[in-house]
Curated annotation (Swiss-Prot):
Reaction(s) this enzyme catalyzes, per UniProt: a 1,2-diacyl-sn-glycero-3-phospho-L-serine + H(+) = a 1,2-diacyl-sn-glycero-3-phosphoethanolamine + CO2
Family in the record: Belongs to the phosphatidylserine decarboxylase family. PSD-B subfamily. Prokaryotic type II sub-subfamily.
Entry annotation: catalytic residues: D113 (charge relay system), H169 (charge relay system), S256 (charge relay system), S256 (schiff-base intermediate with substrate)
Organism: Desulfitobacterium hafniense (strain DSM 10664 / DCB-2)
Residues annotated as site: Cleavage (non-hydrolytic): G255, S256
Protein name: Phosphatidylserine decarboxylase proenzyme
Length: 298
């Protein structure tokens, strides 16, 4: 059971997890862990399933998925019958009216929909995966010089489960450098898996880039793939100016995670999100929602 905080209702909710029984069996049983290490985490497994989900025959999975998780497709650009495959449905675009971006330029907005954790004044060599398991930023991006810029900064971790909107966006105007790709495995990023696999983010396939934002400094953005995420698609053009809210990219099928690292004294996260993180709960947020502010005097 995964419990998260809904800041709109100020209540705790239970997450509906796609494939929950299989995830728990895989990461909690000797046979499941053996299957995970020999088959599931491999690129071939995710690539094959991704190939299937790109095929027209996979359309038959869409309606049952929508019904099971009570998804609102009235906010999607396409109608249900117009999706060419399950992946086409999975990384669907939303109507412009579906999400509103906080109008204040000093507001730090969410890059997408998902469950958020926020850590301030971070120790780069002891980043929290879950309680008792840590990793370092140097291990994560394999670039010590870049990592050192974020000493005592802020780390945001946005987890996108399979039922979420799977496109991610720029949180400010600015210019983004090219993305660096790091090969890796395909472990699930579900909290169950995070408790079982040490340094999971450092093990999985991932991409990172530096976004030179106009109001929040140089932001390190890291997209982490997961089980059955065959592709992390970067839809932006490097070195070209972008506007606040412009799309940066999207994930194909699977749960995924985006991490943002901010330099010291650049932002202040909203107190409710920080408090829930300290209590061990993720906070559910939507793209464009205010999650913090620019640090005064910066």
């Amino acid at each position: 059971m995964i419990k998260y905080y809904d800041r709109k209702t100020q209540t705790y909710q239970i997450e509906k997890v796609a494939g929950e029984k299989m995830i728990r069996w895989t990461y909690s049983s000797p046979v499941g862990m053996r299957l995970l290490e020999t088959v599931v985490k491999k690129r071939m497994c995710s690539s094959f399933y991704g190939w299937y989900l790109d095929r027209r025959i996979s359309r038959r999975k869409i309606h049952p998925f929508v019904c099971k998780f009570d998804l609102d497709l009235s906010i999607a650009e396409k109608n249900l019958k117009d999706f060419s495959s399950f992946n086409d449905f999975f990384y669907r675009k939303l109507k412009p009216s579906a999400r509103s971006i906080d109008p204040c330029q000093d507001s730090l907005i969410s890059l997408g929909d998902g469950k958020l954790l926020a850590y301030e004044d971070i120790n780069l060599d002891c980043l929290v995966q879950v309680k008792g398991l840590t990793y370092s930023l140097k291990e994560l991006i394999k670039d010590p010089e870049t990592a050192s810029k974020y000493k005592r900064g802020t780390c945001l971790i946005l987890r996108l489960c399979p039922t979420d909107y799977h496109r991610f966006h720029f949180i400010d105007s600015g210019i983004c450098e090219p993305s660096h790709r790091i090969k890796g495995s395909y472990y699930s990023v579900n909290p169950v898996a995070l408790q079982k696999v040490a340094k999971l983010f450092c093990e999985n396939k991932r991409e990172w880039s530096i976004f030179h934002s106009d109001h929040f400094g140089d932001i390190l953005t890291i997209e982490v793939g997961a089980t059955f995420v065959g592709s992390i698609i970067q839809s932006y053009t490097p070195h070209q100016p972008v506007a606040r809210g412009d799309e940066k990219g999207y994930f194909k099928f699977g749960g995924s995670t985006v991490l943002l690292f901010f330099e010291e004294n650049k932002i202040k996260i909203d107190p409710d999100i920080v408090e829930q993180t300290k209590l061990g709960y993720e906070t559910y947020i939507l793209f464009g929602e205010k999650i913090g502010v620019r640090h005064k005097g910066r």
